[in-house]
């Protein structure tokens, strides 16, 4: 049975797409049992949590993965480093006004070269950096924060596009639900919390191009989950608490783990696509930002609470002039 992408469309006023992080954010709380909606300041999240609950967050750290490069003609090309393979080799996505003919040698801002070659993927290319240093150090010198295209920023590095608990470098996008937390809020949480690591890939920005969303293929991302987290969640279930995932990356990590033949710690790749009809295994609640129309992230929310209720929540958020997407306000589903 087909699932029409237009079921996940809604009218989002452009002015509600936040361009910068607010000092104080709002929280829309949706209670699944009674279908009740409230809007509070984000710091009041602690009143909706109990000691038996647990929060699972993503401690990935955004790397400055956007690079400027130039063709021999002088035409500009943007490189987005998806994965660092070795000191001189990476998997990248390219963006330019005209299709890049491969293989291609591009000139970097440092004056050094990078060779771009095709792979079996239509999106991801192989890049060989002919540089004196390693790629990670090169990104620190010349890379920029890979902000989504709808956020206009002149800053090369945006310090606000990083969670307060970011630890392990590798993401090209922040797990933005975590941006609402401060160390002060973490210290006042009434329940335990822990961290998975999923390095958010460029696939998070890719649109669904099929009318039938079931034909969409998610981009692979690697995650790491520990025995400590698995034990925490099992204990939470035993104590009738709720496992609340902070962000869609944490949702996908936990649901993918609980779909394995054995629930064990380790590093895995996942291309799990959560949409209506998905059978949830472990996540009881979600903290997430407000997402764009027709996005896989909004489809995940529709799966969690039903498409009709998701649209109702979003309409109320729009009427309340809550901010959307990366720097926007948050939604707590419990």
What are these model-derived regions, one by one?
Residues 1-334:
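A cross-family signal for N-terminal binding/gating loops and helix N-caps
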């Amino acid at each position: 049975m087909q699932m029409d992408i237009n079921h996940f469309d809604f009218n989002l006023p452009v002015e509600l797409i936040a361009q910068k992080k607010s000092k104080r954010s709002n929280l829309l709380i949706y209670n699944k049992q009674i279908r009740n909606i409230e809007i509070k300041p984000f710091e009041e999240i602690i009143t909706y949590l109990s000691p038996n609950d647990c929060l699972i967050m993503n401690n990935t750290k955004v790397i400055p993965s956007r690079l400027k490069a130039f063709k021999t003609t002088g035409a500009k090309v943007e490189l987005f480093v998806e994965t660092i393979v070795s000191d001189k080799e990476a998997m990248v996505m390219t963006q330019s006004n005209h299709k890049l003919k491969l293989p291609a040698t591009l000139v970097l801002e440092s004056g050094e070269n990078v060779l771009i070659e095709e792979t079996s993927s239509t999106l991801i290319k192989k890049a060989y950096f002919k540089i004196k240093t390693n790629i990670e150090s090169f990104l620190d010198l010349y890379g920029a924060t890979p902000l989504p295209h709808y956020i206009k920023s002149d800053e090369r590095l945006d310090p606000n596009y990083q969670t307060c608990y970011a630890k392990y470098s590798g993401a090209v996008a922040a797990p933005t639900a975590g941006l609402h937390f401060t160390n002060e809020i973490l210290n006042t949480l009434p329940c335990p919390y822990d961290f998975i690591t999923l390095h958010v890939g460029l696939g998070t920005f890719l649109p669904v191009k099929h009318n039938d969303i079931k034909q969409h293929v998610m981009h692979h991302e690697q995650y790491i989950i520990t025995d400590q987290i698995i034990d925490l969640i099992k204990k939470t279930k035993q104590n009738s608490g709720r496992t609340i995932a902070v962000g869609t990356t944490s949702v996908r990590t936990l649901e993918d783990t609980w779909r394995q033949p054995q629930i064990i710690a380790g590093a895995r790749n996942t291309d799990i696509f959560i949409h209506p009809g998905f059978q949830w295994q472990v996540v009881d609640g979600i903290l997430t930002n407000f997402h764009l129309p027709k996005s896989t992230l909004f489809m995940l929310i529709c799966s969690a609470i039903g498409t009709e209720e998701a649209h109702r929540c979003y309409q109320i958020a729009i009427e309340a002039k809550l901010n959307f997407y990366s720097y926007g306000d948050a939604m707590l589903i419990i």
